[in-house]
Structures are given as C-alpha cells and as structure tokens.
Amino acid sequence: MFSGIIEEVGTVESYDGETLVVRANQVLDDLEISESIMVAGACLTVTELSETDSTFTVETVPETRNRTNFGALEQGSKVNLERSLRYGDRVGGHIVQGHVDGVGTVRSVVEDGNSRVIVIEAPANIIESVVEKGFITVDGTSLTVVDRNKDSFSIAIIPYTFDHTTLNERPEGSKVNLEADVTAKYVANLIEPYIGKLQK
C-alpha cells in the first residue's frame, strides 16, 4: 500500500521488457529485497539491490506491461518512486494500491496562475470511477480531480509537485499510468448487481 506522495524520481538504467533496473538514491535507504516499491504507479517487488551502482531491480509480468506505459521505458527514462507504507506512517495523499487500471493520454497542459491544469483522456472503466474533487493516481502521484467529462478529467498541479515528479516531462500526447480511487471501485462493484433491479 502507498500514499501517492512521490519520494524521488529515479532513472531507468535498463529494461528488456521483463527485468527493470532503476537508479535511485533516497528510496534505497532501508529498502530490502522482496519488499514492494511503486514505480510510475505500479507496485513491483524488489528482486536485487546494488549499493555500488545505486540501483534496484524489479520484474514485470505480461499483466503489468499490458496495463501500463512501461512499453515506452528505455535507458534514461524518468520514473516516480515511492516505498510501501508501514503501519504508523503518515498518509499524505490517499490510499494507493499500485494496481494500475489503465493508461491515459495527456490532452493538454495549460498554465493557470501558479499552477498547471492538465487534462487527461482516460478509458471508460477509469472515468466511471473518477469523482470531481476526489482522488486519482497519475504515474503514482496522488492528485485531486478538478472536474470530469465523459472521456476525460482535469487535475491542477502546484509548482512543487510539478518540479518533483515526472509530470514536468509529460507534454500533450504523453501516456500516463492511471489508478482510480480504490474506494470508488469497491463501491461501484458492490452496487453494480443492484443497479438493474433499481431501474425496473
């Protein structure tokens, strides 16, 4: 479990479609093999650590590759990183599972005062769980939804978040990993069997 507060932006050292090696600094502190780490919004298991190279290694499976933008990763790509929460940790964002629901496309990035408003086009299965002023996870970052349309939603990014995440490298047309708020997904799943009955 994570909170969507990015600790560090790491750099991809190598990725062959299965084994992903990431160079980092801060998140390596007390990180252990077999622990979970969120990479660009996806919860992955650490399989190797290298103190000499300041890298960690994770493995991706077909389900991860099909659900994420990992197909575009290459040496030098930047990725948001967050270690898993421990009991007693402060949850600065919201409850994030690290289970990416799908990939969205940045439709526009517009400066608005000291913020940037980003509009993201998203698949229907994600849009139906997006709530205005609710939470959404974009490439692992916990963000608040400004508004929602039938096929897109917008988020407002403060300067600190823009400067300390990969959102500053996501121009129009970029693909981003999305995870809808888990609470919304559970509620939708619980009431779905009864919707048809209520409509009769």
Predicted segment positions?
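Conserved loop->alpha-helix
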Residues: 1-200
